[in-house]
Amino acid sequence: LELRVAAYRSLTHSDLLALMGSRPSTQRASLYARCRLALSADARRFWDARSELIDAGIGAAGKFERYFRIFARRVLPLVHRRRTVLELLVPRSAPERAEFYDHQWDTAAWRALFRVFFSETVLGWLGRDPSFFRYAEGSVADHLLARVRHALVVLDPSVNPYVAWILTGTHGESLPHALRAEHFETIREHLDRLEWHQLPIEAVVHRDMVDRIDRANLSDIFEYMSEDNSAALLAQLASRSRPGARFAYWNMMVPRLGASLLPMRLRAMPELSRRLFLADKAFFYRDFVVDEVLP
């Protein structure tokens, strides 16, 4: 995050995309050098020792992102030619997408290799911390395969930056909102509003680092937590939240519903949650949940 903030401060929009890996580039080392002095000493030491991650694009520096990079470069070519991958990303109607998926993409070789590469064993070895599966329910590969069909048929892959990133290693013409040109100056002008802390989220509450919470994006934090610990965290957050505050989070392999765990403090918003989930371009999750804090 600190390097991304420095990149917004120090680079043009096109150079930001190059450093992130959204666009091909051979100049990432020099782009990093322009951001380096805007980093703390700890962040400089971290990135100075990881030039290979910079050369690959800092957007792919995480373990899960590197896992997808292996998939695009080493696994996918075993079952689909580059031309087929690019054809998948051509704009089509929903019936045309279904036709292409069923007759060109969803081959027996694709399904077999996908189930191996996205099995719990391989995913735990290369892509996720093994603790991710402690509370998981069901087959990871089967879940992801079903979600892939949703992303490639129900949604339009030609305008999905995450599909393009996973399959080609770049975002193509479609970018995540935070990287779009029309938002670049707005983000740059408000970078001073950001804070980052290397702490458990519970510590942020206990140390009075927040006054009142209006909104909380909890990502997929509950994938790594037991039901009791999830309920305890939600109670702590609710105690620091204004009435009407909203918590948003994703479920992938661990079903967690805050309003069920904490019915006296949280109200489910099923219609909003479902509408956003069906449109979510981050397609590998099983559910997207929005809860509202009760008075």
Residue ranges and their predicted role:
Residues 199-217:
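A short acidic, Gly/Pro-enriched loop at the edge of an enzyme's catalytic core
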Residues 213-228:
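A short SAM/SAH-binding and catalytic strip from SAM-dependent methyltransferases
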Residues 2-187:
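Class I S-adenosyl-L-methionine-dependent methyltransferase module
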Residues 215-217, 241-256:
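Conserved beta-strand signature within the Rossmann-like core of class I S-adenosyl-L-methionine
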Residues 248-271:
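Conserved class I S-adenosyl-L-methionine
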Residues 269-295:
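Core SAM-dependent methyltransferase catalytic element
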Residues 229-243:
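A short glycine-rich, Lys/Arg-flanked "PGG" loop and its adjoining helix->strand segment in the class I
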